[in-house]
Structures are given as C-alpha cells and as structure tokens.
C-alpha cells in the first residue's frame, strides 16, 4: 500500500514538473515574442524617424541652396546696379562740368553783350527824361537798344533779332556793329538809308540770298533820328512801329502809331532786296515817344493765360503819361511780372520811353 502511494506521488510530481516546464517554456516564448515585436516596432519607428529626418534634411538643404542661389543672384544684381550707379554718377559729373563750362561761357558772353549796350551815363546824358525796360528771356538776349549822337542828331533804336539766347545774341552783335558802321563810318543820317545799308551788309555777312529759304536770320527794328533843335523825328521801321503821345493843350490826349514796313532787316520778298521807307513827324516839347520789341505784347498770362497784346500796352502808356519816366518804367515792369505770373517768359522784352 505504501509502495502504491509512493508511485502515485511520484507520478503526480512528474506531471506537475512537466506542466511547470511546459508553462515556463510558453512564458519564455511569449516573452521572446514580445521582445521580437518590441524590437520590430522600435526598428519601424526608427526607420520612419530616419525617413522623416532625411525628408526634412532634404527640404532644409534645398531651401539653403535656393537661398544661396538667390543671394548670389542678388549680389550680382547689386554689383550691376552699383556699376550702373557709378557710371551714371560719372556721366552726371561730366554733364555738370559741361553745363558749368557752357554757363560760364554764356555768362562771359553776357558781359560782352552788356558791354556793347549804351552805358547809362551816355543814355541819360542824351535823354535825361527817359527809361529802358530791358528783360532778356535767357542770360543772353536777341533784343538790344542802341543810341548814338552826331551834332544835333540823335539816333536811337529798339531792335529784336531772330530768336533769343545765344543765336539771338550773336545776330544782335552783328546788327549793333552794322548800325554803328552805317552812322559813324558811312555817315548816313536818314533812318531808311541806315536800314537799307544794314540790310545789305547783313545779307553779305550771313551769305543769305532768296534761294536759301531755310535761312531766316533777320531783325525787326524801330529806328528814330531826332533833331534836338527842330524836334523833327525821322523814323523807319522793320515790322516794329512806334507810339507817340502828343501833348496838346485843351485837346483830348491820344496815342498815335507810326507804322513800320512789313518786312524785317535781312529779308527778301519776291526775290528782291527790299527798300525801307522813312516818315517825318514834327514833335513838340514834352511829347512822348515809345519804341519796343514784340516781347511785352506777346507774353502769355492773366487769368486766362492769353497774350498781353498791343492794345493793353497802349492803354497803360496812355493812362500813365503824366507820371515821370522812372515811374512809368516801374509800372510796366510790375504789370509784366503780374501778368506773366508763374508762366514762362516767352521772349526777350524791350520797351523804351523818351520824353522830348
């Protein structure tokens, strides 16, 4: 009985050991499987993370590369811009130097032109009661005034040469010298003879003929010769008339216009050199004579931006005839400035007033 019991115990023990061993093996397998799965999961996570890092690194690298290319392109553009800027600055400097040289030359020419105009002392010694309103459009002027005296005869002119600025100034100097030559060398006293002489000499000096229709270097002028003893005024004009205000007692004062020949000095009409005519006017003491170019009347301005015109000029002269010549000049200057306003001056301006 004891032996049988012992066998049963042994069998039970062996079975339990076998079962324990089997369960242990299963647990070990499960643990192993878990370890394998865990390692596989970790490996997958690592691969995904590595892939993401590679993608991120790629985009970062590409962005840096594009930025580098953009920086290089920007540097190239900046370099080109800087080179262009330096070129422009250099050219600007050259232009400024050239402009300075040109302006200096024009200023010097201005001094030469002003030097040939009658000095104030000479002018006012001949005509104490007079004025000259002279306002060039540019530094140099195509307008000029001229005066000369021989015995009892006084020669006075207001001239407007073709153009303004440098071209007008060059022609004005030529014509100024021709007037001097006509009176002082050729001893001409009649204003028509003087203009005919200047006309002939000007065409020779400029090699100008009727065949050269493109050449239009001429001069509009009003030329007066006053006999200071008899007060007879001899006048000849090329396009430019003169105004006279006669001081007559107990009569309505009017302004009269002495008309000019309708062609300029230096012109050909119908293939012929034109001859100027002269007109004689007997003046009285205190009569007023006005000579002028077209610059004042042609100035645009006023509320509507229109030309000033000769009628307004006549009205101003007539309204202010009893004022001194200095006051008349001041009124003309103020009227011109106010009329022009902010508009550009269109031409040289010259107005001469003389009280006989």
What are these regions (language model features)?
Residues 35, 63, 160, 294, ...:
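Conserved acidic
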Residues 222, 279-291, 296-356:
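C-terminal catalytic subdomain
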Residues 1, 29-32, 199, 262, ...:
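Generic hydrophobic alpha-helical scaffold/packing signal
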Residues 87-288, 341-356:
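… and, occasionally, acidic/histidine-rich disordered N-termini of signaling adaptors
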Residues 7, 245, 268, 299-300:
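Residues that scaffold the ATP/ADP-binding catalytic core of kinase and kinase-like folds
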Residues 20, 68, 165-166, 170, ...:
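Charged alpha-helical signal-transmission linkers that cap and connect PAS-family sensory domains
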Residues 1-89:
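Hydrophobic positions within repeat-based interaction scaffolds
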